[in-house]
Amino acid sequence: MSLVACECLPSPGLEPEPCSRARSQAHVYLEQIRNRVALGVPDMTKRDYLVDAATQIRLALERDVSEDYEAAFNHYQNGVDVLLRGIHVDPNKERREAVKLKITKYLRRAEEIFNCHLQRPLSSGASPSAGFSSLRLRPIRTLSSAVEQLRGCRVVGVIEKVQLVQDPATGGTFVVKSLPRCHMVSRERLTIIPHGVPYMTKLLRYFVSEDSIFLHLEHVQGGTLWSHLLSQAHSRHSGLSSGSTQERMKAQLNPHLNLLTPARLPSGHAPGQDRIALEPPRTSPNLLLAGEAPSTRPQREAEGEPTARTSTSGSSDLPKAPGGHLHLQARRAGQNSDAGPPRGLTWVPEGAGPVLGGCGRGMDQSCLSADGAGRGCGRATWSVREEQVKQWAAEMLVALEALHEQGVLCRDLHPGNLLLDQAGHIRLTYFGQWSEVEPQCCGEAVDNLYSAPEVGGISELTEACDWWSFGSLLYELLTGMALSQSHPSGIQAHTQLQLPEWLSRPAASLLTELLQFEPTRRLGMGEGGVSKLKSHPFFSTIQWSKLVG
């Protein structure tokens, strides 16, 4: 297959050269179109050239993310051609300057695509697919859709730093999470779009704009596991002191549906903010390219997956949603819910069987969770049967194993990433990897010991960092106390893990083997790998084949 640059030369007098000289020819072409400002078309209007350029750039972005680099290169060329012809006759000086900046950016990206992805197969004789990343996951890229399809959708809620959106055609709701594109594709970081991961939120579609990748994700309505546990403790405490027998029976019969009372959405939204904001304000208010809209855009994040939580820190600058009720936990940091457990609550577990209980964290302003999954000075109690924790742990393990098999590391798995569906099963928020999205870790996940000690350092991360996070989450579920609370000075190479005496021996053994300071010594690494982790006595009653099925 010949290179696009060989087929689409701008000047009719030039003859195509052999593909062996494709790289030099591409550079010649790019240099030519940089100097073609004088070759304008007199009758081209402002509206025509911006609309035509937007069409070409949108197609280039879609093909770029889908890793169809030859088509992307072609569309970038066409888009730049249109802009160069139009800028010559555009009377608006401010708009001309903005267009020049766009041209520079598109030329830079076209050259990067050629140098990184197109020259290698042609010059080395390799197959055209030889430099394309993540080929085994290419079928999932059929989920890519035109970003304009999002424009008709209505924002009905804001859940932390993602948007709850309604499809006007079906009336169904889904979650939209935006990831900022850095426009510098990493050669080392491949694009990996996981699919078929059990116990993880499903990616339904994704959309590409000039500056962002928008993930269209399944809406898991159960809220976070941590909010469920805290509300259960509160409802049981309330049931002991007040409430009808019928209400207490209902809570016992529906343990997985007894979630926090839906919170009212923020008020004071401005007109026009009930639509998805696809782009930030532009350099020039008159310049709209690639489906851009001059409106406030969602907070952009780099990693994690979304239905009720995200895995990056920072405050949200999302547009406020229309008033109404959101039927899942949507409380922001610093806002209290009537259903939240009171500070200082002490609840004595009752009933037969091994029951685990302890002191957990209360409400606090944290990037991890607004429902108690971050640092907190308040103390709340929950109790969970070890068998139930074992089931949730097995579901988390299966999800992490599948992500690792597809080449994805979570790095900062924390309570905000653990959702609970209406059947009571764990659902991880969505994790993926994009060559154009710079990975970031939640700083508070590191500070609160949810992330492994090596995260944020200079050493290359392995699956071991997720097994630490897995152990940290299990520590909190089993003991009721966060790892950072029981180890306020952190965990070093010679730190002795603090475990309550009442913890079962298999549970204590599992936590000790997972929370090893040295990554290579953690359970799940080295000889035996994940199989050794699955065969640990703590999971002796788990039927793994049925769990995956």
UniProtKB/Swiss-Prot annotation:
Keywords: ATP-binding, Kinase, Nucleotide-binding, Ribonucleoprotein, Ribosomal protein, Serine/threonine-protein kinase, Transferase
Catalysed reactions, as listed in the record: L-seryl-[protein] + ATP = O-phospho-L-seryl-[protein] + ADP + H(+); L-threonyl-[protein] + ATP = O-phospho-L-threonyl-[protein] + ADP + H(+)
Catalytic site: D412
UniProt cross-references to Pfam families, sorted A to Z: MIT, Pkinase
Domain Protein kinase, residue spans: 145-539
SMART domains: MIT
InterPro entries: Intracell_Sig-Traffick_Protein (IPR051866), Kinase-like_dom_sf (IPR011009), MIT_dom (IPR007330), MIT_dom_sf (IPR036181), Prot_kinase_dom (IPR000719), STK_RPK118-like (IPR035053)
Membrane-spanning intervals of the chain: none
Classification via CDD domains: MIT_SNX15, STKc_RPK118_like
PROSITE patterns from the UniProt entry: PROTEIN_KINASE_DOM (PS50011)
Residues holding ATP: R151, G152, C153, R154, V155, V156, G157, V158, I159, K177
GO molecular function ontology, one term from the record: protein serine kinase activity
EC number, as in UniProt: 2.7.11.1
Region named Disordered: 260-325, 330-349
Cellular component terms per the entry's GO annotation: ribonucleoprotein complex; ribosome
Top-rank taxon, per record: Eukaryota
Membership in a protein family: Belongs to the protein kinase superfamily. Ser/Thr protein kinase family. S6 kinase subfamily.
Designated name of the protein: Ribosomal protein S6 kinase-like 1
Organism: Homo sapiens
